[in-house]
């Protein structure tokens, strides 16, 4: 079974979403990120590639750079550029490219599912890249970027997504690369509970993109569990940020939402 949970997302207000949105951290280098964020203090690159706030050539793996990430993450929240929802939700993220729109459910995926092999991998990972993202997760106490999972098509989940996306989206914009980004908040408690039940009937999830981010999030969550003498299993660190797409809708790309992982009790 696939264990998921809703969560209180940390996300930009509508007025700021286009300025905050960025490409994934690993599809561009530091100088490219610096150029894309030029003149935009709200760009998420200041958190996911914080070396852009230092002189060119700064080692992106230095302690000062990781520290800058959390300083910027905190500052974004203090200034209201990222705001945490006041209740737990699932969300729907959709992307339009080349005339095709694909829809994914944004969920908290279970660390234990990854450790047990219920979340399936198809790539080997490098320890140095895992450790880089682990440091980023540790210092921010959050998953700043999601991973992408695929799940076997499910007609009831399809129906829920269709119903929820029949209303105007919370976010709806076209990025400079021409991709459309659309986002809905699932607010109905019965719908949220039913989504959880339906995923519990799915034997496995499959990593579509983000093997290193998945490994890092799961390893840090497992680490926090070992360090917590009062660990129960329902703390936020037991889950990490994932967008789950029906297998028939892949391939995918994404925008940003944050799942906090600092809860201990």
Report residues per predicted region.
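N-terminal extension/subdomain marker
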Residues: 1-162
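Short, conserved secondary-structure transition motifs
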Residues: 242-254
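Active-site beta-strand/loop microenvironment that shapes enzyme catalytic pockets
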Residues: 184-229, 235-237
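Short helix/loop capping segments that flank catalytic or ligand/cofactor-binding pockets
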Residues: 115-116, 158-160, 215-217, 251-254
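Conserved small/polar residues in nucleotide/adenosyl-binding loops
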Residues: 255-261
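Short, structured patches in soluble enzyme cores that scaffold and shape functional sites
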Residues: 110, 151-153, 209, 218, ...
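A short, charged helix-loop
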Residues: 171-189
């Amino acid at each position: 079974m696939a264990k998921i949970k809703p969560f209180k997302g940390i996300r930009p207000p509508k007025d700021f979403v286009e300025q905050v949105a960025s490409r994934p951290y690993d599809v561009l280098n530091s100088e490219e990120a610096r150029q894309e964020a030029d003149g935009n203090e709200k760009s998420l690159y200041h958190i996911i590639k914080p070396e852009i706030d230092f002189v060119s050539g700064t080692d992106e793996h230095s302690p000062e750079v990781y520290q800058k990430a959390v300083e910027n993450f905190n500052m974004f929240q203090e200034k209201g550029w990222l705001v945490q929802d006041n209740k737990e939700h699932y969300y729907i993220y959709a992307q339009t490219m080349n005339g095709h729109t694909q829809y994914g459910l944004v969920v908290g995926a279970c660390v234990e599912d990854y450790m047990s092999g219920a979340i399936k991998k198809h790539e080997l990972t490098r320890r140095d890249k895992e450790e880089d993202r682990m440091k980023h997760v540790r210092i921010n106490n959050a998953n700043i970027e999601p991973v992408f999972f695929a799940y076997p098509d499910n007609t009831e989940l399809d129906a829920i997504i269709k119903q929820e996306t029949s209303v105007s989206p919370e976010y709806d914009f076209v990025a400079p690369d021409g991709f459309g980004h659309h986002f809905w908040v699932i607010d109905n408690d019965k719908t949220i509970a039913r989504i959880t039940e339906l995923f519990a009937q799915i034997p496995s999830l499959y990593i579509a993109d983000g093997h290193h981010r998945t490994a890092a999030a799961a390893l840090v969550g497992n680490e926090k569990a070992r360090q917590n003498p009062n660990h129960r299993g329902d703390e936020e660190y037991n889950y990490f940020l994932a967008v789950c797409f029906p297998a028939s809708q892949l391939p995918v790309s994404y925008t940003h939402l944050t799942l906090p992982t600092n809860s201990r009790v």
